[in-house]
């Protein structure tokens, strides 16, 4: 199992488009992916679950990946988040 903590950098947080991009990226991997924000935990492969986290800009989230491709999954998701989900700075 690998984990990482990240700050949501895009201007709108985990709304539909970023959550959708996250799910598309997470679904490329076999690992189980969980995302936590505050005391809530979400399935990283469920757009509705991620949106219900209510992670706003500046929020910290923790991603946990467990499985055969866990490191690759975490790296891909980190790149997506740190790249502001493709949003210009």
Locate predicted features:
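A composition-driven signal for long, intrinsically disordered, charge-rich low-complexity tracts
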Residues: 1, 30-31, 39, 84-85, ...
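Intrinsic-disorder/low-complexity, polar/charged segments enriched in Ser/Thr/Lys/Arg/Asp/Glu/Gln
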Residues: 1-5, 60-62
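C-terminal structural segments of small proteins and small subunits
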Residues: 56-89
């Amino acid at each position: 199992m690998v984990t990482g903590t990240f700050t949501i950098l895009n201007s709108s947080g985990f709304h539909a488009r970023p959550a959708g991009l996250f799910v598309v990226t997470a679904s490329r991997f076999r690992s189980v992916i969980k995302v936590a924000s505050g005391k809530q935990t979400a399935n990283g492969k469920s757009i509705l679950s991620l949106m219900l986290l209510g992670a706003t800009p500046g929020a910290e989230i923790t991603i946990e990946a467990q499985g055969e491709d866990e490191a690759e999954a975490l790296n891909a998701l980190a790149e997506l988040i740190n790249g502001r989900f493709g949003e210009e700075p």
